[in-house]
């Protein structure tokens, strides 16, 4: 989230966020609700929304409108944090561009570095385990564009219902998918 806020000239860093959201460094989890709360209370000049059930086309529409998108995805650590650690964790990645010719997104990744090229297929695989959740941070003057792009997903309850239907269909077609 620090990278996202810095995109809009915020002058803090990840440690500023951690003071409020992760006071215990060993805690590997910060959820989207906590991130949205931080934006609303510490970067109030920006709007923030998060939704579930995103897809590749939606990401591209938002990026084409000049709105970076942060997604939550699966991440695997190389070294365990504790005995029997499965090395799996959540990770946020800020998408800033895409290339249809190469079927990739450009991601700003706090772990792997800037301008990472992420194939659409890999992004879908890693994003799926978090219900394709996405976070949007944007200035107020972009709200009309965000509403138009999200369409019926702008309404939070409608977004949840539509996503529930989508995942119920997926469970019927692939009951082996743990996510």
Question: What annotation goes with each model-predicted range?
Answer:
Residues 1-57, 65, 131-159:
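Cysteine-nucleophile protease catalytic domains, especially the papain-like/related folds used
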Residues 7-10, 15, 75-77, 92, ...:
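Phenylalanine-focused residue identity feature
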Residues 34-45, 71-80, 95-99, 157-164:
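Short, Lys/Arg-enriched charge-dense amphipathic segments
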Residues 54-110, 116-117:
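Active-site-adjacent substructure of cysteine-protease-like catalytic cores
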Residues 82, 87, 98-179:
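Noncatalytic regulatory segments and standalone regulatory/sensor domains
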């Amino acid at each position: 989230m620090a990278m996202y806020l810095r995109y809009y000239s915020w002058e803090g860093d990840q440690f500023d966020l951690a003071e409020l959201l992760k006071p215990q460094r060993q805690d590997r989890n910060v959820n989207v609700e906590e991130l949205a709360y931080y934006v609303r209370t510490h970067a109030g000049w920006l709007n923030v929304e998060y939704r579930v059930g995103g897809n590749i086309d939606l990401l591209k529409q938002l990026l084409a409108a000049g709105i970076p998108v942060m997604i939550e995805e699966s991440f695997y650590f190389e070294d365990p944090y504790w005995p029997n650690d499965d090395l799996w964790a959540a990770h946020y990645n800020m998408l800033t561009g895409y290339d249809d010719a190469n079927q990739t997104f450009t991601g700003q990744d706090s772990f792997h570095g800037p301008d990472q090229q992420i194939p659409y297929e890999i992004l879908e695989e890693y994003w799926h385990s978090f219900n394709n959740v996405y976070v949007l941070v944007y200035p107020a003057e972009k709200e009309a564009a965000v509403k138009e792009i999200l369409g019926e997903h702008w309404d939070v309850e409608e977004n949840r219902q539509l996503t529930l239907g989508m995942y119920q269909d997926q469970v019927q077609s692939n009951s082996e998918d743990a996510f």
